[in-house]
Swiss-Prot record:
Protein name (database record): Beta-glucuronidase
Domain writeup: The N-K motif seems to be a discriminant that could be employed as a fingerprint to identify beta-glucuronidases from the large GH2 family of proteins.
Activity profile over pH: Optimum pH is 5.0-7.5.
Source organism of this protein record: Escherichia coli (strain K12)
Gene3D superfamilies registered for this protein in UniProt: Galactose-binding domain-like (2.60.120.260), Glycosidases (3.20.20.80), Immunoglobulins (2.60.40.10)
Subunit structure: Homotetramer.
One cellular component (GO) term of this entry: protein-containing complex
GO BP, sorted A to Z: carbohydrate metabolic process; glucuronoside catabolic process
InterPro entries per record: Beta-gal/glucu_dom_sf (IPR036156), Galactose-bd-like_sf (IPR008979), Glyco_hydro_2 (IPR006101), Glyco_hydro_2_AS (IPR023232), Glyco_hydro_2_cat (IPR006103), Glyco_hydro_2_CS (IPR023230), Glyco_hydro_2_Ig-like (IPR006102), Glyco_hydro_2_N (IPR006104)
Residue window of motif N-K motif: 566-568
Active site: E413 (proton donor), E504 (nucleophile)
Enzyme Commission (EC) number: 3.2.1.31
Length: 603
């Protein structure tokens, strides 16, 4: 799915700003056809943004069910005769949309875009009413899963099995955009780089309802190569490669023409190669070592609402600390984030929202509502698998052309020990490879699924591990934790002979808490714990990356294990550094960029 851009043939009207907002406490909005008139008892709400924290009302913050958004929109007079499309970049977790009284689309899945051609339902030079019913409920057949229960007071309550707050609403931009009636509908680009990096090729495939031509232009807008037709290959001599740390981008200018119209779409292209060879992860045929974070789209007041200021500041902090990569834990991030990564040479592991496929973590289950078996008709079943496949399809369709995206992660921390795990994940791994044969794939492994009990890791190209020795187990005992961690990593290395990326490692740390004795929760313990992990990483040859959990403290559901959210951040939720930020900055900026440190750290 192409991201809307303004060109000589296309225009965009952003609908971000204040909308009318109403809770549907009685779940009567559909029956009463709320889209047919102005919302009653509404209040103003900011879009984009989660609805949960915009008001001083705990009932709204923890609300489960339907909410409604509405606003009047003027259609520019100059849009007459154009194709007009309404697009939502993300509605969490389900959205149904009306233009005036006409239902135009619905979408399940909270982190990927959806759109509809609304040309038949609008008139240029007049206003229309746009109404959206948003539902934030999760069940075992949604991605991510959850359960809706009713408490003793008859109030619905959303439980979920992932450790971050279930923010909901219209989280990203809403827009109208135009195209001519002859238009470019989709583009797929795949780049190949010769072993000596002195030659590259760019394969293109275009979906359009007109005659197609393409021009590849360099960053100075000089034409490098041209082609005709809906598919083909362009040759590039002495290409300027997209590299980690240097986001050089070409532009593939695609034109679709009919006898009376033409459409122009410029797609930014990074020429680079990605491959796994033995225990190495290769970018442009060179071994690459990941440094960085698992992150969250999470901020005070905004929740998961996209914010440009936060994006700029977070990337400034990542640049300062020496991070060269991150994972979109645990859902696809805003497209603006990937554009930034493309431009700045940041390497991204792109993940679906499949998190919480686990009965063993103790998250989200009330007494008596825990299924007996994870992979079963009452929990993760065939319908779940189809929803999961759809999430993979939408992720790849949106992000396939981003050079920063070097690997797909199809799930985070599923329990892969029980019967049924391999039967569930094997078809999804196969489907992901068919959808994109050009990138490695992974499924992030949870701590208790070790080399002896896991049943699926051989289905993937890279082993991504989340490990917390010295925190959840061997608590406070760094000497024992170091031995156990190294023993497990060596067991995986011997079993799979794959690259290993530690996609999560971290400890909860209260900013300002200090200890002469390196006690847990103190800033001193966070530093000592990270130092220990780094010694192990440097000794295990298959480890090709370290992504700390987490970049910043983030909101979670209430519970006795979480005091004001998850505190594993290297930065606080308002982006103040803890002591460990300076430890990481010294380690990561002291490395040769993208290269693994020399082995050392003898015990």
């Amino acid at each position: 799915m192409l991201r809307p851009v303004e060109t000589p043939t296309r225009e965009i009207k952003k609908l971000d700003g204040l909308w009318a907002f109403s809770l549907d406490r009685e779940n009567c909005g559909i029956d009463q056809r709320w889209w047919e008139s102005a919302l009653q008892e509404s209040r103003a709400i900011a879009v984009p943004g989660s609805f949960n924290d915009q008001f001083a009302d705990a009932d709204i913050r923890n609300y489960a069910g339907n909410v409604w958004y509405q606003r009047e929109v003027f259609i520019p007079k100059g849009w007459a005769g154009q194709r007009i499309v309404l697009r939502f970049d993300a509605v969490t977790h389900y959205g149904k949309v009306w233009v005036n009284n006409q239902e135009v689309m619905e979408h399940q899945g909270g982190y990927t875009p959806f759109e509809a051609d609304v040309t038949p339902y609008v008139i240029a030079g007049k206003s229309v009413r746009i109404t959206v019913c948003v539902n934030n409920e999760l069940n075992w057949q949604t991605i991510p899963p959850g359960m809706v229960i009713t408490d003793e007071n008859g109030k619905k309550k959303q439980s979920y099995f992932h450790d971050f707050f279930n923010y909901a609403g219209i989280h990203r931009s809403v827009m109208l955009y135009t195209t001519p009636n002859t238009w470019v509908d989709d583009i797929t680009v795949v780049t190949h780089v010769a072993q000596d990096c002195n030659h590259a090729s760019v394969d293109w495939q275009v979906v359009a309802n007109g005659d197609v031509s393409v021009e590849l232009r360099d960053a100075d807008q000089q034409v490098v190569a041209t082609g005709q037709g809906t598919s083909g290959t362009l040759q590039v001599v002495n290409p300027h490669l997209w590299q980690p740390g240097e986001g050089y981008l070409y532009e593939l200018c695609v034109t679709a023409k009919s006898q009376t119209e033409c459409d122009i779409y410029p797609l930014r292209v990074g020429i680079r190669s990605v491959a796994v060879k033995g225990e190495q992860f290769l970018i442009n045929h060179k071994p690459f070592y990941f440094t960085g974070f698992g992150r969250h789209e999470d901020a005070d007041l905004r929740g998961k609402g996209f914010d440009n200021v936060l994006m700029v500041h977070d990337h400034a902090l990542m640049d300062w600390i020496g991070a060269n990569s991150y994972r979109t834990s645990h859902y696809p991030y805003a497209e603006e984030m990937l554009d930034w990564a493309d431009e700045h040479g940041i390497v991204v592991i792109d993940e679906t929202a499949a998190v919480g496929f686990n009965l063993s973590l103790g998250i989200g289950f009330e007494a008596g509502n825990k299924p007996k078996e994870l992979y079963s008709e009452e929990a993760v079943n065939g319908e779940t698998q189809q929803a999961h496949l759809q999430a993979i399809k939408e992720l790849i369709a949106r992000d396939k052309n981003h050079p920063s995206v070097v690997m797909w992660s199809i799930a985070n921390e599923p329990d892969t020990r029980p019967q049924g795990a391999r039967e569930y994940f094997a078809p999804l791994a196969e489907a992901t490879r068919k959808l994109d044969p050009t990138r490695p794939i992974t499924c992030v492994n949870v701590m208790f699924c070790d080399a002896h009990t896991d049943t699926i890791s051989d289905l993937f190209d890279v082993l991504c591990l989340n490990r917390y020795y010295g925190w959840y187990v061997q608590s406070g005992d760094l000497e024992t934790a170091e031995k156990v961690l190294e023993k497990e990593l060596l067991a995986w290395q011997e079993k799979l002979h794959q690259p290993i990326i530690i996609t999560e490692y971290g400890v909860d740390t209260l900013a300002g808490l200090h200890s002469m004795y390196t006690d847990m929760w103190s800033e001193e313990y966070q530093c000592a714990w990270l130092d220990m992990y780094h010694r192990v990483f440097d000794r295990v040859s298959a480890v090709v990356g370290e992504q700390v959990w987490n970049f910043a403290d983030f909101a979670t559901s209430q519970g006795i294990l979480r005091v004001g959210g998850n505190k594993k951040g290297i930065f606080t939720r308002d982006r103040k550094p803890k002591s460990a930020a300076f430890l990481l900055q010294k380690r990561w900026t002291g490395m040769n960029f993208g290269e693994k440190p020399q082995q050392g750290g003898k015990q």
